[in-house]
Amino acid sequence: MSQARIIKAAAAQISPVLNEAEGTLHKVLDTIDQAARQGVQIIVFPETFVPYYPYFSFIRPPMASGAEHMALYEHAVVVPGPITDAVAQRARQHGMVVVLGVNERDHGTIYNTQLIFDENGALLLKRRKITPTFHERMVWGQGDGSGLKVVDTRVGRVGALACWEHYNPLARYALMTEHEEIHCAQFPGSLVGPIFAEQMEVTIRHHALESGCFVVNATGWL
């Protein structure tokens, strides 16, 4: 899209329902409904919001986190599946673009996955975080570059990256070459204090400036 237009976007900076995928899903659907009442056309949720970001990996050693790993695996999202079907239906109902981060379960592995649903409820993009960050490698498998794409929606050309992928110049460049107009940045909540927020703001401002696109940044709330 090259014509001038006004888009109303929302960053859903909310907390999940820990250890309860259905509870977090209902929170997602309720938030979409609330955003629709306010005229929102695109909404972005935080990194791996469904069922929840693995905060346990920040504070417990892997060998002591077996139960937490199994709980996350059991609640992880199958794509496509009942959870994605429910989100797609709500996106279609409101004519809204929905960008959702999930823990995706596939063939025995959990992935950090970003989903983009268009205004018709179609799943336009499923991409996996290419290289999980530091402690995350004990939780998620590696993705690949096949998801570094920008998709056409009613609000324009939309792309997404997760957290520390914004420090990967080639990942950002891949989206720039596809003429990204709206960038969806997803981050978890932080246990390390204000330095995380400061770094986050620098990197998303940098991407907006360098790419010439708008950035919607959604960060989890602890």
Predicted regions and their residues:
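Short beta-strand scaffold segments in enzyme catalytic cores
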Residues: 100-102, 113-116, 149
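Residue-level recognition of short loop/turn positions
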Residues: 120-121, 155
